[in-house]
């Protein structure tokens, strides 16, 4: 009878120890990098990016943006963003490509700490400047066509022209 009780006590103790060890968190463990980073909005001087939230307590998100994919240029910036899965990034130039990474850390700091786990870089693009309408000039005309010129908009790779026939 004593052996059965001892076995039961040992089984309960092993079970309790297993639960304690399973719930133990390594305070020095690095957080996971966010996935699913994508651009969702663009303005002439800003972009908005979203990502899948990392399921961990006390996460602090950071972003960094650069005009080169290796983040070696002097334009690299980082900014703290607590408990959010979207960030508005401003202060960019119109019609230009940038690279953005989202990072996570449990360290709360004004800039990204050394233990930040960074996502893969994505390319984001700001909206090009608009063509100033008074810069559009007719440079030629034929019986069925016209030629136009205008001052190029910074960062534009195509233009949409809308023509109206006047007097009808």
Task: Give the label of every model feature segment.
Residues 28-57, 94, 111-155:
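Pro/Thr/Ser/Gly-rich low-complexity, intrinsically disordered linker/stalk tracts
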Residues 1-5:
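N-terminal secretory signal peptides that target proteins for export/translocation
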Residues 82-87:
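Short S/T/G- and acidic-enriched coil/turn segments that sit immediately N-terminal to beta-strands
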Residues 74-78, 114-115:
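Short, tandemly repeated low-complexity microdomains enriched for cysteine and small residues
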Residues 89-110:
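Beta-strand-rich modules
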Residues 12-22:
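Bacterial N-terminal signal peptides
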Residues 55-76, 153-168:
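Extracellular low-complexity, O-glycosylation-prone stalks/linkers
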Residues 34, 51, 63-65, 89, ...:
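An aromatic-rich alpha-helical recognition segment common to small helix-rich domains
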